[in-house]
Amino acid sequence: MKPLLLLVAVALGLATVVSVVSAGPEAIECWFVEDAGGGGLSKKPATLLLRHGPRGPPPRPDLDPKLYFKVDDPAGMLLAAFRRYPAGASAPHCEMSRFIPFPASAKWARSLSPEQNCPRALDGDWLLVSVSSTLFSLSSLLRPQPEPLREPVVITMATVVLTVLTHNPAPRVQLGKDAVLDLRFAYAPSALEGSPSLDAGPPPFGLEWRRQHRGKGHLLLAATPGLAGRMPPAQEKATAFAAWDDDEPWGPWTGNGTFWLPAVKPSQEGVYLATVHLPYLQGQVSLELTVHKAPRVSLTPAPVVWAAPGEAPPELLCLASHFFPAEGLEVKWELRGGPGGSSRKVEGKTWLSTIRHHSDGSVSQSGHLQLPPVTAKQHGVHYVCRVYHSSLPASGRSADVTLEVAGFSGPSIEDGIGLFLSAFLLLGLLKVLGWLAAYWTIPEVSKEKATAASLTIPRNSKKSQ
């Protein structure tokens, strides 16, 4: 029994070690940005302490105590995002600034804030924290305590009230496929907030998705679930999951605002802004959607190109068809086999054609190779065109043809099959000719006897008649 208990204890210890190792960073270094006057901005170092050891928060004498924050996250969304942050990943970019609660300015969202003046419960300091990385992007509203704690370390407590989060800040979608833009949000009213309404359950909220492309903003979808009011129609057949996950009476609450865009086109590339509106509070994240489509690669003439010694083979055309984006296509030519046997750069004149556009938004482009005269030693070499594009893996995509030099080609399998069939048909033809010759060489008398014999009626037949 003791060995079993020992194994259980070891397993629990390993699980604890793994959880500690994978718990993400202890603190996030940020920049506190504020107006410096005269149109300029000032930046000061700040830190969000996410967790600490049993000895308490580590001292940070290099920071202003009002910019050293110990984070309390009742909903847990901000802390959960950082717990999954890999240890070897580059540090996320973090900025914070002051935030002033205000009612939503959009007409469709005015029902969220019936009073234009913010409740006194929202008075005090607010911080807007924006974190961006390759793994996630989030925006959080924090409510710091008025004064820092002095013991055991000078630090300011800050409570997370609203978090808006996406786990895929840079989605890449294949041309013609559906785009699903992830969005989650969480809300935990602080004790100081004191909701003016006594109604239990999550508060009303508004969801807004906009796209910015080439400097232009475009509202795609707006929703205020459960509230009356005229909403602008959704554009481009877009839909979204706009709902709280639960209706617990006092929170905290989490919600889903994931956006769905069917059959994306190149014109739908751009930066998408997702905004969650609560009464007098807002959180926003940005996602950059890119559209791609890998090219199909073909090489002509194929699979064999012929040339006589001292003559140039026909021009080779490497076609990269129906790809997107149009920029960044690269075609490289290689020569495999022949003297040396290794792959090397091919000699000849190369160029790219102009881009051809297709109705689905994709494009095609071809690379050309004009070869110099060949020699007998080049018989059997392979000309390879390799296409590189942002939609392809780093190794690219290739097609090849084989050079056959006239007078140096040995019989192939196809040649052997053709010879066998030819011999079989020739043998059959010879037999037929032999039969015909034998028939026509029979003497005429024998033919007449054979004919008379075939016309003689037997006597037995006459009697029967």
From Swiss-Prot:
Record's keyword annotation contains Disulfide bond: yes
Compartments where found: Endoplasmic reticulum membrane
Positions on the Lumenal side per record topology: 24-416
Residues annotated as domain Ig-like C1-type: 295-402
Site residues, May be involved in interaction with TAP: K431
Signal peptide: 1-23
Residues passing through the membrane, by range: 417-437
Cytoplasmic side: 438-465
Residues annotated as glycosylated: N256
Record keywords, A-Z: Disulfide bond, Endoplasmic reticulum, Glycoprotein, Immunoglobulin domain, Membrane, Signal, Transmembrane, Transmembrane helix
Lipid bilayer topology: Single-pass type I membrane protein
One GO BP: defense response
Molecular function in Gene Ontology: peptide antigen binding
Chief location: endoplasmic reticulum
A cellular component annotation (GO) from this entry: Tapasin-ERp57 complex
Disulphide-bridged cysteine pairs: C30-C94, C318-C385
Function: Involved in the association of MHC class I with transporter associated with antigen processing (TAP) and in the assembly of MHC class I with peptide (peptide loading).
Domain writeup: The N-terminus is required for efficient association with MHC class I molecule and for a stable interaction between MHC I and calreticulin. Binding to TAP is mediated by the C-terminal region.
Subunit structure: Heterodimer with PDIA3; disulfide-linked. Obligatory mediator for the interaction between newly assembled MHC class I molecules, calreticulin, PDIA3 and TAP. Up to 4 MHC class I/tapasin complexes bind to 1 TAP. Interacts with HLA-G-B2M complex; this interaction is required for loading of high affinity peptides. On its own or as part of MHC class I peptide loading complex, interacts with ligand-free MR1 or MR1-B2M complex, providing for stable MR1 pools ready for metabolite antigen processing.
Protein name, UniProt field: Tapasin
Record organism: Mus musculus
Gene behind the chain: Tapbp
